[in-house]
Each structure stands twice: as C-alpha cells, then as structure tokens.
C-alpha cells in the first residue's frame, strides 16, 4: 500500500509557497516533567487555502496535523474544526543543544542559559535516502551556501527530466536556502538548512539533509555556535510519568523504509522501559493499546481512570491576524 508516497504527492501538489512562519518557545517544565504546551483547536476559514497554510501559522508540520485529525483532507473545507498538536512530550534526551526526532518531524533547540526549548518543524530524508540517527555537533556555519549536487542527485533529477548544473550559486533559488549548518558526522555530507521549496518542510522528501522554513533556520543559525551538540533520534513512541503521578504516551506513525509499507499499521520498536511503564498498576493498559493503535501524534493520558483525550485544549475558533491563541505554557514569537 503506497499510502505514504501518495499522501506526500497530494500534499506537495496542494501546498503553495507561503513564507510566513513562527518560532515556538515552550517554557521548560519542572524537573522530572516532560509534558509541555497545550493542544488547540482551529476552525478552517474561507481564506485558508490548504493545510500547509494552517501548519505554518502554528509553526508545525502538516503531517502532524494529519496525524492528530486522522481523516482530515490535505485541503480541508471551511468550517472544519481541527486539532493543532501543540502539546508534546520532550524527547528522552539531555536538554542541551539540538535534538532532532525524525519520527515526529521536529527539531528541538535548548538555548544555553535560557529556561526554554524552541521547537521547529522539519523535512527529512525520503525512503532509501534516510536521515541517519547520529550523535554529532555543528561543524560549520555557512551563510549564503552554494549547492553542489551529488552524482546521485543529478541522476535522479535527469530521470525526472531535470538537468542540474554542477554548482547552484547562493541566492533565492538555491535549494539550501540562505543558511546552512554542516554537521560533523561522517564526511560532513549532512546539513541542517533552509530551502527554496517551503512546501517540503514537514515531509520526507530530502536526500538526507534536514530542511527548515526560512525564518526558522535564520533564527536557529543566529543562535547556535560551532560545536553545539546535535543528537538525531528516531523515536515514534514517547512516554512520561509526570511529577503529579499522571501517565502520558505520545505515539507517532513510524518511518517506513519502503513505499509499500502502511505507516498506520507497521510495528514499532518500543523505547527502553516501556514494558515496565505499561505494566504499572497506575496505567490503564487498554488506553495504552488504543494510543498505540491510533497514533495521534500528541500526548494522551493513560493513567488508570483517565479518558483517552489530551488535556487542556483551548479553543482557537478563528485566530486573529494569523496568530494562534497563546496560553501560559506556550509562547509564539516571530
């Protein structure tokens, strides 16, 4: 079943190049907590051309909105009420530098000396050209990068009837955008960079690099230093026991290795400690099973006696001036 590839093509065909984006800052939770933010609801308006326009408004990935709403169309009808998945569990990793979770199409940045985490949507490698899991660092900051297509990229482009030049100069048409962070992994072939195709952010379409919206990479580029640690993980299932005793799981669709795989039904590799978490008497195992089946992409309470809905979801019936409603757990800044 070629669900993933067909959905990607549908999204790319439907999305227009919209430049507006927002940086989302979450205040760090107390020690021992990983739950941040609040889910929001939004009613699609007449002027909303497509799902990507809505995703950019909330600086999230269109794929995450599709996960959260399950049956929504890539071009939702006006009047449709959708969930914006802006509540999340922080990755189970040290809160420093850059953390990329491929499975959730998100990049986390912990600015040194600040009690916040910045969360950005990203685009990653497609099947056969996957972005690798790695622990590395920012090896080089490159403003106004040029792009030298590899032999493989040039061949794949020729197969689509596109002849690429040996070198693409810096500028608005450069596929790397205006800013690039070269990772020290391997031979330095992997970058975190902008893009001349903003439709691709939030999808699996790159040759292995990590793509960001233009305003997002500009903000990240200005903040990070050479040597900043970078950890790339692939964890579709996250879980947390909060200080107040509440239990949560956040489940994303796993990354498929082949187009024929159905990401809604393919099995998971569960994180360490998950079996013990599920078997605890304070956890409702039926709610865990429902969360693993549903794969909604946002935290769900699985505490015994809880309901399978995410907590604290304020209504954003019609965001004014294109801005989402702001709660005390979420700050949105340009």
From Swiss-Prot:
InterPro entries: LD-transpeptidase, LD_TPept_cat_dom, Ldt_C, LysM_dom, LysM_dom_sf, Transpep_catalytic_dom
E.C. number: 2.-.-.-
Gene Ontology annotations of biological process type: cell wall organization; peptidoglycan biosynthetic process; peptidoglycan-protein cross-linking; regulation of cell shape
PROSITE patterns (alphabetical): LD_TPASE, LYSM
Catalytic residues (positions): 193, 209
Pathway note: Cell wall biogenesis; peptidoglycan biosynthesis
Signal peptide interval: 1-23
Keyword Transit peptide in record: no
Name of the protein this chain belongs to: Probable L,D-transpeptidase YnhG
PANTHER family noted in UniProt: L,D-TRANSPEPTIDASE (PTHR30582), L,D-TRANSPEPTIDASE YNHG-RELATED (PTHR30582:SF29)
SUPFAM superfamilies to which the protein is assigned, alphabetical: L,D-transpeptidase catalytic domain-like (SSF141523)
Bias (Polar residues): 303-323
Ranges for region Disordered: 303-334
Record's subunit section: Interacts with DsbG.
Sequence ranges assigned to domain LysM in this UniProt record: 40-84
Lineage: superkingdom: Bacteria
Subcellular location, principal: periplasm
Presence of the UniProt keyword Signal in the record: yes
Residue ranges of every copy of the L,D-TPase catalytic domain listed in the record: 96-233
GO MF term (any one): peptidoglycan L,D-transpeptidase activity
A Gene Ontology term for the protein's cellular component: periplasmic space
Gene coding for it: ynhG
EC primary class: transferase
Phenotype seen when the gene is deleted: Simultaneous disruption of erfK, ybiS, ycfS and ynhG leads to loss of covalent anchoring of the major outer membrane lipoprotein (Lpp) to the peptidoglycan. Overexpression of ynhG in this background increases meso-diaminopimelyl-3-a meso-diaminopimelyl-3 cross-links but does not restore Lpp anchoring.
Annotated localization: Periplasm
UniProt function note: Responsible, at least in part, for generating a meso-diaminopimelyl-3-a meso-diaminopimelyl-3 cross-link.
Family per similarity comment: Belongs to the YkuD family.
């Amino acid at each position: 079943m070629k669900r993933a590839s067909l959905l990607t093509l549908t999204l790319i065909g439907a999305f227009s190049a919209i430049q507006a984006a927002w940086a989302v800052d979450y205040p760090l939770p107390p020690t021992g907590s990983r739950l941040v933010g609040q889910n929001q609801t939004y009613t699609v308006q007449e002027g909303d051309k497509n799902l990507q326009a809505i995703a950019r408004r909330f600086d999230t990935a269109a794929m995450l909105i599709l996960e959260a709403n399950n049956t929504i169309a890539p071009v939702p009808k006006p009047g449709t009420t959708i969930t914006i998945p802006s509540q999340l569990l922080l990755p189970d990793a040290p809160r420093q530098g850059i953390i990329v979770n491929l499975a959730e199409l998100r990049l986390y940045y912990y600015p040194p000396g600040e009690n916040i985490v910045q969360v950005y949507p990203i685009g990653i490698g497609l099947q056969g050209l996957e972005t690798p899991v790695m622990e590395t660092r920012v090896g080089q900051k490159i403003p106004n990068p040029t792009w030298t297509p590899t032999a493989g990229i040039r061949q794949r482009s020729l197969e689509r009837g596109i002849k690429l030049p040996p070198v693409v100069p810096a500028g608005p048409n450069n596929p790397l955008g205006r800013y690039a962070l070269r990772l020290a992994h391997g031979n330095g072939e992997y970058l975190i960079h902008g893009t001349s195709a903003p439709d691709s952010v939030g999808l699996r379409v790159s040759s292995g690099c990590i793509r960001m919206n233009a305003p997002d990479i500009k903000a990240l580029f200005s903040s990070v230093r050479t040597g900043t640690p970078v950890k790339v993980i692939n964890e579709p299932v996250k879980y947390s026991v909060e200080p107040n005793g509440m239990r949560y799981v956040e489940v994303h669709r796993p990354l498929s290795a082949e187009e024929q795989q159905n990401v809604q039904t393919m099995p998971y590799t569960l994180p360490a400690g998950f079996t013990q978490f599920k078997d605890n008497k304070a956890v409702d195992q039926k709610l865990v099973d429902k969360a693993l089946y549903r794969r909604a992409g946002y935290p769900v309470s699985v505490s015994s006696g809880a309901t399978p809905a995410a907590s604290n979801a304020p209504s954003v019936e019609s965001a004014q001036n294109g801005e989402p409603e702001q709660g005390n757990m979420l700050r949105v800044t340009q």
